[in-house]
Amino acid sequence: MSSAMNWILSLGLFFLLKEQCYCIFAPNSTFLENLLNKYKDTTPHSRTRRAILRTDKEEIIQLHNKLRGQVHPSASNMEYMTWDDELEKSAEAWAEECIWEHGPTALLMSIGQNLAVHWGRYRQPAYHVQSWYDEVKDYTYPYPHECNPYCPERCSGPMCTHYTQIVWATTTKVGCAVNVCKRMNVWGDIWENAVYLVCNYSPKGNWIGEAPYKNGRPCSECPPSYGGNCQNNLCYKGDKHYGREGIVTNEVETPRFPEETPVWDHKKSNKPKAVPKTTQTSTENLMTQAIKCATKMRDSCKGSTCNRYKCPPGCINSKAKVFGTLFYDSMSSICRAAIHYGVIDNSGGLVDITRKGRLQFFVKSTRNSVESISKFKPANSFMVSKVSAQTIDCYTTVAEICQFVKPATHCPRFNCPAHCKNEPSYWAPVIGTNIYADSSSICKTAVHAGVIKDGEGGYVDVMPVEKKKHYFGSNKNGIQSDSIQNHKEGQAFRIFAVKQ
């Protein structure tokens, strides 16, 4: 491998996830100098430029459309993508912040977003676009007969949502920006002169339970507005690449944990000093979403961490609507539905959500001072349930309490004791990284994942998931987890910090 090999990392909406190795290389000073010169203004002492070069814009658009037109299985409704100036501006604003996470929060309600960062040798933005698309190798397309009513999420790698956002059929606009960050914290390491790429998309994709596109003969199901025009397997209106059109609403996944990337073992040279890897509590790796009284199920459901919410007090007096009884329409307020069902009272609290598929109608009733509304129209539904808390010891496993059962399983919020780190592995094993075998010790796993401190213990949230064939060990926070190949027993889980 070349000694100029660079670090490449990509981040895709939990925010998850679903993921923490680094690619080490010896940077070439000439490459780095050229890169910095390319993205800086020529005036003395000017700020780093975030606008992207027109040649890069054209390459990004051409590559997106090329990749969208060659999906397999073929897409019957894949639309042509154009550049959007407003999305570019929003990407510039976020790239300027030099924060390695999705944002800003207010904007994520209306756009999709892919992120990438590298350090060292120059890479064109299209290089990262291709790397996002390359997640296709881990993605299995859900055919219509598998969607009953929700399509299964089948990603055998650490992340597939960058790929699905790129090939989301109804996403028709993209705008990107590049910024050279003087100092950027990337998962605990401080990178100097980090090259940060932000691409914003609209309408956003990655709706939970939906396929990214319809399978069929190319252009056979294009929207009527395209007038039957087709170009390179894409629904096509004209040859205009750039536009100043408004942002349209849709949904994107926020990963909640970093990706597992291959380790390229090269000689170190001029690498920025890394922040010491000490035991620390992650403030970003959260499963519970804090929401408002008016937040609807459909508006809030982002990524796989879409089942636990924290409601504020005072929602009885809110005017947000609730449709149904027991089974609630996805356009209902989550918190008021929870009060209606009796899961929480007007003081707020935690609510677990279970999606229940499409129902033909919803029946009104008045319960706990909340009046729900009837709706005689088919829609997706959900149920609410109470979140309990359970104190456990260092040896308790997910398999003992809440092993994954399709379609979904909820676990209590667990309270871990301190000092589980040094418990022997034959009593308190930890198997895997980011996604763990459910025979692992919950509390020792929490220390390994960095969601609690060993000397303090504390609360953690757990999400049971389907088992993985392979689990890869790692040494994190003073704990060496185990690797297992061709694992056939049990299921798996993910673990999250709790923000008190």
From Swiss-Prot:
Example GO CC term: the record gives: extracellular region
List locations, semicolon-separated.
Answer: Secreted
- Function recorded in the entry: Promotes matrix assembly.
Q: Which InterPro entries match?
A: Allrgn_V5/Tpx1_CS, CAP_dom, CAP_sf, CRISP-LCCL_domain, CRISP-related, LCCL, LCCL_sf
Q: Which residues form the LCCL domain?
A: 287-382, 388-491
Extract the CDD domains matched here.
CAP_CRISPLD2
Gene3D superfamilies named among the record's database cross-references? CAP, LCCL-like domain
Q: Which family does it belong to?
A: Belongs to the CRISP family.
Outline the segment boundaries, as ranges, of region: Disordered.
260-281
Q: Domain SCP: where?
A: 62-201
Any Pfam family:
CAP
Name of this protein: Cysteine-rich secretory protein LCCL domain-containing 2
**Which organism does this sequence originate in?**
Xenopus tropicalis (Western clawed frog)
- Keywords, ordered alphabetically: Disulfide bond, Repeat, Secreted, Signal
What PROSITE patterns is this protein classified in? CRISP_2 (PS01010), LCCL (PS50820)
Q: What residue range is the signal peptide? A: 1-23
Listed as disulfide-bonded, the cysteine pairs are C293-C311, C315-C335, C394-C416, C420-C443
Q: Which SUPFAM superfamilies match?
A: LCCL domain, PR-1-like
Keyword presence, Disulfide bond: yes
Primary location class: secreted
